[in-house]
Design a protein with these regions (language model features):
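CoA-thioester-processing core
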Residues: 60-63, 67, 81-135, 150, ...
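Terminal peptide-recognition signature
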Residues: 11, 23, 88, 123, ...
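Amphipathic alpha-helical segments at domain termini/boundaries
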Residues: 86-90, 131-184
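Conserved AMP-binding
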Residues: 78
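Glycine-rich phosphate-binding loop at the start of an alpha helix
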Residues: 21, 43-46, 50, 82, ...
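A structural preference for short, pocket-lining loop segments at secondary-structure junctions
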Residues: 1-40, 51-75, 97-102
Length: 184
């Protein structure tokens, strides 16, 4: 982020989908790798994810002046579930391809867990608690168009325009576009 030649970042996938969620065996591995203190292993692993996503969210912004950051956009070509939505929620703008088979959401509750990488907090901050509740407590997933209507996705674009539109936004984003309201 310190390189002046880099104007911003677009996080995307070359595959038809962005991410269908995290392999839950990773959570089990965090616990077993910790030996005698599985709770500490799980805590440290989850906090590591939080630190990474917070770096995306801050994107080099000086915490005192709120200046100097770089815009980060998520460009979702298809399905984005679980961590596949938590990563975009840490970005400054979420673009999704108008893909009728794509599903977007946080279905973790369906297996008895909450989004662990900050998605719970970021979704509530983006939508407010009442609007976020069905997505968090029911594991509701839906199409890109319906997620735009709900306020989760910022723009739905033609699949062949996804990267071009995200790039256009990154190159024209202002500092006001990249400072989250809760950081002000």
């Amino acid at each position: 982020m310190g390189d002046a030649a880099i104007k911003g970042v677009i996080i995307t996938s070359a595959k038809k989908d962005f991410a269908g969620g995290m392999d839950l065996n990773i959570i089990a591995r965090m616990k077993t790798d910790a030996g005698d203190d599985p709770a500490r292993g799980l805590f440290d692993g989850i906090m590591g994810m939080h630190r990474i996503l917070r770096k995306i969210e801050r994107a080099g912004t000086d915490p005192k002046t709120l200046k100097g950051g770089k815009p980060v956009a998520a460009a979702l070509p298809g399905t984005a579930l679980g961590i596949g939505l938590e990563i975009p929620l840490a970005c400054h703008r979420i673009f999704a391809a108008d893909n009728p088979r794509a599903k977007i959401g946080l279905p973790e509750i369906m297996v008895g867990i909450f989004p662990g990488a900050g998605g719970t907090t970021r979704l509530v901050r983006k939508l407010g608690p009442m609007m976020a509740a069905p997505f968090l407590l029911e594991g509701k997933t839906d199409s890109p168009a319906k997620m735009k209507a709900a306020g989760i996705v910022d723009e739905v674009v033609a699949p062949d325009q996804l990267l071009a539109r995200a790039c256009e936004w990154v190159l024209n984003a202002t500092e006001a576009d990249i400072v989250k309201p809760f950081d002000q």
